[in-house]
Amino acid sequence: MFSRDLTLARFDADLFAAMQQEAKRQEDHIELIASENYTSPAVMEAQGSVLTNKYAEGYPGKRYYGGCEYVDVVEQLAIDRAKELFGADYANVQPHAGSQANAAVYLALLSAGDTILGMSLAHGGHLTHGASVSSSGKLYNAVQYGINDQGLIDYDEVERLAVEHKPKMIVAGFSAYSQKLDFARFREIADKVGAYLFVDMAHVAGLVAAGVYPNPVPFADVVTTTTHKTLRGPRGGLILAKKNEEIEKKLNSAVFPGAQGGPLEHVIAAKAVCFKEALQPEFKAYQQQVVKNAQAMAEVFIQRGFDVVSGGTQNHLFLLSLIKQDITGKDADAALGRAHITVNKNSVPNDPRSPFVTSGLRIGTPAVTTRGFGEAECRELAGWICDILDNMGDESVIDAVRGKVEAVCAKFPVYGN
């Protein structure tokens, strides 16, 4: 029998100490990684619940194990809320991650060797959209589209590639693109060549849920997303679709038993919580502020002489090119890290440097907006970053900025009382 008095702090002091240090880092550092956010205590409570003890292979009402009557309720709540949130007829909440959701879509609708047309990783796409190092680029014949000199997707070029290569699936989605996608145009191109349209909205799902970014569900054959990032839930995946019994059956079979075994019901419970949070009126205000904050930061960088890819942003992120300044993304990332500002180095279009070094930074505002930052704080923050980038190697500038970061973090705690 377990004793509730045997806490983690008492049983495993080393692990607990590391966790406490990470909690302190999150409070004391400004988080600008576009794919990161902070979950609510309710999400974490669900994820740390007794649901972690239950095996539940199958789907609600059709399990391979007994004793699933309550996890069925949990999973059905998540399904129903996801469908309501995104206006979908179908939802599968079992994928353990966004990459696994994408793999399940490919498994459901493609055969090995089929052609897919997706956005190039070097131009802002994702590994799972056909990058050569990913299974999506190894199992399928991946053709890639990119962005033009203005940093925008050239839809005529996408159409030309689709007509030339006749893909079975067109993938729309990104990990580093700051403008809105034209889902109607993608649908038109897909229909012209008889391809499935698959949208990966992992980065913008929260914006979509709040109605501040176009919803791909009415246009796509299938949509995937992560449940963290802008959606602010647990780390996990989600598949959505319009009503199509044939596709629904294929997707369910591809997730289980095709790609996964037992679902993580404690994570699914946390997804249900985050979907309920996203259905609240204040979530829309939060997402609107996320975009305003990103736009405010981008404006400051442009005013200070830095190049923002595509000239600005219509979502939660933007790419900062440092080619003109001859600064590597790796060095900029490290310098900002010493000031307790966390970003990630990122390749920019036509980057002359390797992906391990890069010539740019990806900056996103979901996490700082969760803390309570508004446009004023974000403009000030962008100015601090510019000060460091304009004085690379000057540790006194980094020290001064770190002091300002500590003060603003104390003013805007992640988890208040």
Swiss-Prot record:
Cellular-component GO terms for this entry: cytosol
Organism this protein belongs to: Stutzerimonas stutzeri (strain A1501)
Function: Catalyzes the reversible interconversion of serine and glycine with tetrahydrofolate (THF) serving as the one-carbon carrier. This reaction serves as the major source of one-carbon groups required for the biosynthesis of purines, thymidylate, methionine, and other important biomolecules. Also exhibits THF-independent aldolase activity toward beta-hydroxyamino acids, producing glycine and aldehydes, via a retro-aldol mechanism.
Positions carrying N6-(pyridoxal phosphate)lysine: K229
Catalytic activity: (6R)-5,10-methylene-5,6,7,8-tetrahydrofolate + glycine + H2O = (6S)-5,6,7,8-tetrahydrofolate + L-serine
Binding positions ((6S)-5,6,7,8-tetrahydrofolate): L121, G125, H126, L127, S354, P355, F356
HAMAP family registered for this protein in UniProt: SHMT
Pathway of action: One-carbon metabolism; tetrahydrofolate interconversion; Amino-acid biosynthesis; glycine biosynthesis; glycine from L-serine: step 1/1
Keyword Metal-binding: no
Assembly information from the UniProt record: Homodimer.
Keywords, in A-Z order: Amino-acid biosynthesis, Cytoplasm, One-carbon metabolism, Pyridoxal phosphate, Transferase
Main location as per UniProt: cytoplasm
Subcellular locations according to the entry: Cytoplasm
Gene Ontology molecular function, alphabetical: glycine hydroxymethyltransferase activity; pyridoxal phosphate binding
Entry annotated with the keyword Transferase: yes
Listed PANTHER family: SERINE HYDROXYMETHYLTRANSFERASE
Protein's recorded name: Serine hydroxymethyltransferase
GO BP: glycine biosynthetic process from serine; tetrahydrofolate interconversion
Family: Belongs to the SHMT family.
InterPro entries: PyrdxlP-dep_Trfase, PyrdxlP-dep_Trfase_major, PyrdxlP-dep_Trfase_small, Ser_HO-MeTrfase, Ser_HO-MeTrfase-like, Ser_HO-MeTrfase_PLP_BS, SHMT-like_dom
Cofactor(s) annotated in UniProt: pyridoxal 5'-phosphate
Site positions for Plays an important role in substrate specificity: H228
EC number in record: 2.1.2.1
